[in-house]
């Protein structure tokens, strides 16, 4: 089930990556700024590494050979089996999942790319707080244990930048965001920096598969719109699919997925392990 270098998805990924990344960058070894990370940097963060191909294949065995709605349903069944974290527990979890590979005292802020002390979490200016990448008002789940505390879409972010992003959908364009170099925003959308465009896409797509309305929360769905308001939907899907190709999973994102699986929720984001499944479903 591993991705072949000859698949159409991989060919598209390679072409898209050339448009986005400097020639010196390598997928899987990018620092917060998007430049190449030192060799072995991710391995120094934690004993938790990336699962073997065999272990990942076994986890997704029930999805093998499926496409479209059948694949989405199979993945939902697999990933809905999980442990849940409380909203207070998210603070300490993010200090592990988003630890800076180069400084174990810091976390990397998702949109800013800034390395910041773990101890500066809170609600004050220049503190970092808990960003819901799938805006919690889109489906009105708030901070309830479940979608409101799911680590697969919660990331550390500067308080001011988090406020600027608000509950906007994701799309291209806008004005530069202060304290988040490479990010842009306008009245109805937010564009993250290049180094996490794919991360954002895969987090949102995970949420749309994991939460289907069957566990007391809204059925979260993707669409090709912005201005979704309080509807249980996020967009713009066509742009997010491009970002999934342009910014493939790197070592930081893969390690994060593994730590969530090993230590906290015991479920995985399938689109980090198999980014080609995005086009298979959508």
Name each model feature, range by range.
Residues 12, 19-113, 277-282:
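N-terminal module-boundary/linker segments of secreted carbohydrate-active enzymes
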Residues 1-11:
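Bacterial N-terminal signal peptides that target proteins for export
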Residues 107-109, 113-120, 124-127:
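Short, His- and charge-rich active-site/binding loops that engage polyanionic ligands
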Residues 123-282:
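Domain-level detector of nuclease and nuclease-like folds
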């Amino acid at each position: 089930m591993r991705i072949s270098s000859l698949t159409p998805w991989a060919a598209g990924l390679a072409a898209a990556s050339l448009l986005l990344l400097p020639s010196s960058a390598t997928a899987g070894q990018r620092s917060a700024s998007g430049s190449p990370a030192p060799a072995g940097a991710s391995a120094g963060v934690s004993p938790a590494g990336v699962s073997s191909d065999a272990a990942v294949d076994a986890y997704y065995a029930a999805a093998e050979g499926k496409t479209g709605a059948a694949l989405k349903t199979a993945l939902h069944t697999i990933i809905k089996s999980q442990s849940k974290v409380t909203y207070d527990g998210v603070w300490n979890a993010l200090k592990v999942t988003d630890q800076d590979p180069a400084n174990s005292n810091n976390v990397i802020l998702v949109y800013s790319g800034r390395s910041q002390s773990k101890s500066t979490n809170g609600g004050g200016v220049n503190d970092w707080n808990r960003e819901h990448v799938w805006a919690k008002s889109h489906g009105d789940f708030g901070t309830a244990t479940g979608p409101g505390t799911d680590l697969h879409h919660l990331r550390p972010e500067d308080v001011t930048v988090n406020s600027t992003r608000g509950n906007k959908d994701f799309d291209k364009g806008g004005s530069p965001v202060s304290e988040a170099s490479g990010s842009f925003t306008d009245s109805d959308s937010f564009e993250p920096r290049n180094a996490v465009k794919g991360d954002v896409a895969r987090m949102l797509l995970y949420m749309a598969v994991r939460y289907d309305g069957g566990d007391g929360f809204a059925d979260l769905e993707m669409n090709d719109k912005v201005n979704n308001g309080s509807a249980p939907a996020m967009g713009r899907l066509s742009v997010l699919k491009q970002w999934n190709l342009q910014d493939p999973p790197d070592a930081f994102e893969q390690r994060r997925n593994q730590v969530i699986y090993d230590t906290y929720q015991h479920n995985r984001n399938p689109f980090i392990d198999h980014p080609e499944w995005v086009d298979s479903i959508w």
